[in-house]
UniProtKB/Swiss-Prot annotation:
Major location (coarse): membrane
Function: Confers resistance to heavy metal ions (e.g. cadmium (CdCl(2)) and copper (CuCl(2))) by chelating them at the plasma membrane of root cells, thus stopping their entry and reducing their accumulation.
Localization of this protein: Cell membrane; Secreted, Cell wall
The protein's name: Protein CADMIUM TOLERANCE 1
Family label: Belongs to the CYSTM1 family.
Organism in which the protein naturally occurs: Echinochloa crus-galli subsp. caudata (Cockspur)
Membrane topology: Single-pass membrane protein
InterPro entries xrefs: CYSTM1_HM_Tolerance, CYSTM_dom
Gene name as annotated: CDT1
């Protein structure tokens, strides 16, 4: 079988910030909102990213 992937060093917030830097504010906000939609909950990290992605 396949081995488990290696642990990732980037946090969710860092990932959203990278998306903001690479693709812009709108993409980062949509990316963050879709994360909450996929996990069916609104977590504090998602709210922080939505509030801060345009700063």
């Amino acid at each position: 079988m396949y081995n488990a992937p290696p642990p990732q060093d980037m946090s969710y917030y860092d990932h959203c910030q990278r998306r903001h830097e690479e693709k812009g504010c709108l993409y980062a906000c949509i990316f963050t909102a879709l994360c909450c939609f996929c996990c069916y909950e609104t977590c504090e990290c998602c709210l922080d990213c939505l509030c801060c992605c345009c700063n």
